[in-house]
């Protein structure tokens, strides 16, 4: 591995890993469940890097031995040929391990392990845009289920002809943000709407925002900036009308963000849920500002995560979903059923390659 700075980083990671392993055996840590969990999680995050580094060191040792045999076996052509073949195989394996180590050493997004609020807003296209937003709610719900994540609809504004003008899903599980952050942006659909009598193809859009969940410590909200009103949940009449005002309408004066929560059973729960969504929205706004600064330095092909960036077109006539960042087409039916893991993995790989190229340029 030519890059000495990478070796220095790997040695540092190895030392940290062994120190965390030692701490797990410390009786003081072992008897403190919270600290034990924190140390165990930190150690687990380094384990693949350390294991890969160990494998790489073993390969270097075997490679040096094979090269020596190849040099010294001039009088034995058969042995020399075997040694040269082993050198070639080990060199290829070493290059593969080095590439993997570079990826493992890339700085991690601090939000990658967080749960998220996924917001879908109908864009241009009227009633058809709301129906399309409903299709996206189903798509992400199916994908979340395939990942064994928990999904809950926490806020909704129904469309007049079906679907949603706006919907917010809470998605919880392992590394939710690390995958779904690549879905942020404008999703465009081209199809003949069910509401269209003449059979003309319409283009509609919906915007997806991915908001990592944050706690009160990470985002401070001044109570004076909040306007809170209550309303009755339920339908227009009959038994579904809630006689108690459990719904909460929250307005954040500095940003103009309005959140209407009706999904929880009590007013207090709806207020807590509205505040949780507000914190996530404010945090996402802060992330957008940071991301725009990064983008000005590195024009990412995989996308900026901006709400205004068109990332995918879903064409019903041609039965294809085109991801504009990857420049690739995918089978529409599979994508609509939530089969987007392949797209997301391709985005992750492309993002990593861009970061590696940037790192190489910076250290050249």
From Swiss-Prot:
PTM annotation, UniProt: Methylated by PrmC. Methylation increases the termination efficiency of RF1.
InterPro entries referenced in this protein's UniProt entry, alphabetically: PCRF, Pep_chain_release_fac_I, Pep_chain_release_fac_I_sf, Prokaryotic/Mito_RF, RF-1
Localization, UniProt: Cytoplasm
GO molecular function, one term: translation release factor activity, codon specific
Gene Ontology CC terms: cytoplasm
Chain positions found as N5-methylglutamine: 239
UniProt keyword terms in alphabetical order: Cytoplasm, Methylation, Protein biosynthesis
Family: Belongs to the prokaryotic/mitochondrial release factor family.
Database matches in NCBIfam families: prfA, PRK00591.1
The protein, known as: Peptide chain release factor 1
Gene source species: Cyanothece sp. (strain PCC 7425 / ATCC 29141)
Lineage, opening ranks: Bacteria, Bacillati, Cyanobacteriota, Cyanophyceae, Gomontiellales
């Amino acid at each position: 591995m030519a890059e000495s700075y990478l070796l220095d980083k790997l040695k540092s990671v190895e030392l940290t890993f062994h120190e965390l392993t030692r701490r797990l055996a410390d009786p003081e840590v072992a008897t403190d469940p919270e600290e034990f969990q924190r140390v165990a999680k930190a150690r687990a995050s380094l384990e693949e890097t350390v294991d890969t580094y160990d494998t790489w060191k073993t390969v270097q040792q075997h490679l040096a031995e094979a090269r020596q045999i190849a040099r010294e076996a001039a009088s034995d052509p058969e042995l020399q040929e075997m040694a040269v073949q082993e050198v070639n195989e080990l060199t290829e394996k070493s290059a593969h391990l080095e590439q993997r180590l570079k990826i493992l050493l890339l700085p991690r997004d601090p939000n990658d392990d967080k749960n998220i609020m996924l917001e879908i807003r109908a864009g241009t296209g009227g009633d058809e845009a709301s129906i399309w937003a409903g299709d996206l709610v189903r798509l992400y719900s199916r994908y979340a289920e395939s990942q064994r994540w928990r999904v809950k609809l926490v806020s909704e504004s129904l469309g007049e002809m079906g679907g949603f003008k706006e919907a917010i899903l809470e998605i919880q599980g392992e590394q939710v943000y690390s995958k779904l952050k690549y879905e942020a942006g404008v999703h465009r659909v081209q199809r003949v709407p069910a509401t269209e009598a003449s059979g003309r193809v319409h283009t509609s859009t919906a915007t997806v925002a991915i908001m990592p969940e944050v706690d009160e410590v990470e985002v401070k909200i001044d109570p004076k900036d909040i306007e809170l009103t209550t309303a009755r949940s339920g339908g227009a009449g009959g038994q579904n009308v809630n006689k108690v005002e459990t719904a909460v309408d929250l307005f954040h004066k500095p940003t103009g963000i309005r959140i209407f929560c009706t999904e929880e059973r009590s007013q207090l729960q709806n207020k807590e849920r509205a505040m949780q969504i507000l914190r996530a929205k404010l945090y996402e706004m802060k992330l957008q500002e940071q991301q725009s600064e990064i983008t000005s330095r590195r024009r990412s092909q995989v996308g900026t995560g901006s709400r205004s960036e068109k990332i995918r077109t879903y064409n019903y006539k041609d039965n294809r979903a085109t991801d504009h960042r990857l420049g690739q087409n995918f089978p529409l039916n599979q994508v609509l059923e939530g089969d987007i893991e392949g797209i997301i993995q391709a985005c992750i790989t492309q993002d990593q390659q861009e970061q590696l190229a940037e790192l190489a340029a910076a250290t050249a």
